[in-house]
Regions:
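C-terminal cap of thioredoxin/glutaredoxin-like
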Residues: 2-5, 40-46, 141-239
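Charged/polar interaction segments and conserved charged motifs
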Residues: 3-4, 18, 22, 110-115, ...
Length: 239
């Protein structure tokens, strides 16, 4: 009897699956997921906290367009740039050399800590806007290398999250996060040929890089295959 019951349950599950497929329910759901994935562009940004080109691109391209593009892009920010890192032993402290000096290393670490804290603490739909806003705030500040704590408060992060960021900055975790960013950067290009480097859907191309620097919304609109936001019809995305 028990064996028959198991067979019946298996047959019932198979019958339900066949019914769903025959009525197009599963295929429609899968198509919807596929269309959704097609309409999200992955954007990896390799940058430095004291690089004027990085500041200019984040402040003038990414931040202004993000509100209209946020449903269509997934942004990964990688503060490191043309730095180098090494350590004398597997357990020894990390040593960093940054293109614009020790203050840039501190700024890169602070932003890495902020990105890590937000990603670890916030729901997926919240962490991207908070990350973009915080980094945009820091990169537009007079002193980007030391702006993260104040920007964390300005963008509305909780007291607990601000403490997480401060604790990270003052701990070896900051070094480990920056070293991880360095490994990721080196895997792309070692050293980077230009900062910032913008990678679309995991693949670097000079065409995408040049267009991202000139007109980021236009680049994203060109890669969207389904529904496009209104910014794609604006003059800025067409020029």
């Amino acid at each position: 009897m028990r064996f028959y019951f198991l067979i019946s349950r298996t047959w019932l599950a198979a019958a339900v699956f066949v019914t769903l497929v025959s009525h197009g329910i599963l295929s429609n759901a899968q198509s919807a997921d596929s269309e959704l994935n097609k309409n999200v562009v992955n954007v990896d940004v390799y940058y430095e906290s004291l690089c004027s080109d990085s500041m200019r691109w984040i402040v003038n391209q990414l931040v202004p367009s993000y509100p209209e593009l946020k449903r269509h892009i997934h942004v990964t920010l990688v503060p490191y740039g043309k730095a180098t890192h090494h350590r004398e032993s597997e357990t020894g402290p990390w040593q960093f050399s940054c293109q614009h000096g020790p203050s840039e290393c501190r700024g890169n670490k602070a932003q890495a800590c902020a990105i890590h804290a937000i990603r670890s603490s916030e729901a997926a739909e919240n962490y991207q806007p908070l990350m973009v806003n915080l980094v945009g705030c820091a990169m537009s500040a007079g002193t980007p290398a030391s702006a993260v704590p104040q920007c964390a408060q300005d963008v509305g992060l909780s007291t607990e999250m601000r403490k997480l960021i401060d604790d990270c900055i003052a701990s070896p975790l900051a070094d480990n996060l920056l070293a991880t960013n360095g490994d990721k950067t080196d895997a792309l290009q070692s050293p980077l040929r230009f900062v910032p480097t913008i990678v679309i859907n995991g693949v670097y191309s000079k065409e995408n890089q040049d267009e991202a620097i000139r007109n980021f919304p236009k680049l994203i609109c060109r890669h969207l295959t389904a529904e496009k936001p209104s910014i794609c019809n604006s003059e800025s995305a067409e020029n």
